[in-house]
Regions:
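Conserved beta-hairpin
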Residues: 58-78, 136
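Conserved active-site alpha-helix within GNAT-family acetyltransferase domains
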Residues: 148, 160-162, 171-188, 194-195
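A short beta-loop-alpha structural element at the N-terminal edge
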Residues: 9-23, 27
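Conserved GNAT acetyl-CoA-binding A-motif
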Residues: 128-130, 157-170
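Conserved acetyl-CoA-binding loop-helix of GNAT-fold acetyltransferases
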Residues: 137, 143-156, 180
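Conserved acyl-donor/pantetheine-binding loop and adjacent beta-alpha core of acyl/acetyltransferases
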Residues: 75-136, 142, 192-193
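C-terminal "cap" of GNAT-fold acetyltransferases
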Residues: 168-172, 191-207
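Active-site rim helix/loop that mediates acceptor-substrate recognition in acyltransferases
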Residues: 41-65
Length: 207
């Protein structure tokens, strides 16, 4: 089912979208400061593509927590709390692939990626919440309202169930954008090695 929001429209991500989800998010992030920090120079684009196939593509499709534009030039994926209406737990094969492959994807950077993830996990809201894992729009499709449209289904789940949304970002531009849809900075952080600035943002549910 396509959700029509005027222009643009968004729909739930499907299995057939996984390659393009990975391609879109890789294009968005390939030269980012985060990618340079998280992934070695050797094979960075291939590593990033595989990461997004697993974490954004297969995880989001299998759990029902991903939305895309019709042409998949923009993507939003979430991690939902256990038992959230309309979602499913990640299949065992997806969990196993993530656990097995993430250290290899990050290569020599895995230690700081893992340690930083632990810091972020400790800072997340204590109770059930929706976690915005990935949000990206290809440069050729920006300034069309895709990002805001893609966030609406996940935020609607939050508002219906009375749960907050949260995320972490590494650029101030992302902070400014998310503030426009109701997120606020909960705390400023940095990666475990001090090399990457991070902001944890939380959006309270709206009645």
């Amino acid at each position: 089912m396509t959700v029509h929001l005027g222009a643009p429209s968004v729909r739930p991500a499907e299995q057939r979208d996984v390659p393009r989800i990975a391609a879109t998010l890789t294009l968005v992030q390939a030269t980012s400061r985060w990618a340079r920090w998280a992934l070695p120079d050797d094979g960075r684009v291939q590593r990033l593509t595989r990461l997004h196939e697993l974490d954004a593509g297969h995880r989001a499709v299998s759990t029902g927590t991903g939305w895309v534009t019709e042409d998949v030039t923009a993507v939003a994926t979430w991690e939902a709390p256990d038992g959230a209406p309309g979602t499913r737990p990640p299949p065992e094969d997806v969990r196993a692939a993530l656990a097995q492959e993430l250290p290899h994807i990050s290569g020599s950077h895995w230690s700081r990626v893992r340690e930083t993830r632990e810091l972020v996990d400790a800072a997340r809201p204590a109770g059930p919440h929706w976690w915005l894992a990935h949000l990206g729009t290809r440069p050729s499709s920006r300034r069309r309202g895709y990002g805001t449209a893609l966030l609406r289904p996940g935020l609607a789940h939050c508002d219906t169930t009375g749960l907050p949304a949260a995320t972490v970002v590494s650029t101030w531009a992302a902070v400014r954008f998310l503030r426009r849809v109701g997120f606020e900075v909960d705390r400023a952080m940095e990666s475990s090695d001090g090399a990457l600035p991070l902001w944890l943002l939380v959006r309270p549910p709206r009645s």
